[in-house]
Amino acid sequence: TLSGFVGQAIGLPLPFMLGPLAISALIATALPERLPTGYRFPQKLRLMFIAIIGLMIGAQVTPALFSEAHHYALTFGAVTLFVGLAHAMGYTIFRHLGGYDPTTAFYASTPGGLYESIELGEAAGADVTRLMMQQFLRIIVVVTALPLGLSLWLGAPVGSSAGMTMARPDVPWSDLPLIVLAGLGGLGLGHVLRLPAGQMTGPMALAAALSLTGWLSFDIPQWLVNMAQIVLGTALGMRFTGLSRGLLLRGAALAMAAVGAMLSLGVGLALALHEMTGEAVDVLLITLAPGGVTEMALVALSLQANPAFVTIHHIYRIVLTVLTLGVITRWRQRKG
């Protein structure tokens, strides 16, 4: 928590996520002996706060969102193009620059579907340690580089350090039980329907339905949003636990090269889409970036862009990546 306030004081973008991410990553790599043996960040705690972000995003789904639907053929088409080209670029970097074997390079370079990529890659004989490392580093590099890059481009830090708020600070405490119930209900919905990234899209779908019907509108207090960022940032940083420094440094260099190539592709597509749709370039770039759904939604919220628009495209990116991965995996198995 303290690292979040320090990040805010020095003008760090998304300070309550990037501050804890930096400190927890430092502890996991430089001071691993300070952690309990076999320590893993509690995933149930992470899921609870992802559900809260899902509720926030779902509450932003209004009829106005569908007024942009005539642009969706172009934006979804751009995401489709991005997935194929980004995967090819990542594979080339991991295979030829990193020297990874073809199977590890293939599954490590997917621009989405983190858990599915790891599961299918392990079954196909990939180096699981390197595969997991590169997939988590992809998200961490995007989450770190994108807000910093946008801050430099816009000339001011994005997020709460820039004075932007992502929620109302004056939500009454009496609303908290309702928020908790809705979050639990959304988690159950995501599990039953097996939604992609269901821990967030389930609560998002529930909040969107309640918002569109006018039955209920969710206002999440700012302190709870800050807590969610702290938990998510710490969880990402703790992913470095157990990795040797040499392996991690080499993996980080490869991740920066791969993400740099993918984001460059995203910038080009965002500029082209801006000319065709009139949508802001920064919002389009966030929509195309190969980061985690939850983290990219937080970046969108920090820019006061509609996170529902961004999230819909990220869900499509993940579904498309996983479907393509499944088809190619079956083809590789038949060929092999």
Which residues does each predicted region cover?
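Alpha-helical membrane segments and immediately flanking helix-loop junctions
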Residues: L97-L137, E279-H313
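Membrane-embedded alpha-helical segments of transport systems
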Residues: F82-V83, P111-S117, M132-L154, L265, ...
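Membrane-interface helix termini and inter-helical loops of multi-pass transporters
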Residues: T62-Y72, W153-D170, W215-I220, G246, ...
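Structural signature of multi-pass alpha-helical membrane transport proteins
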Residues: T1-Q43, I52-A64, S174-S244, S264, ...
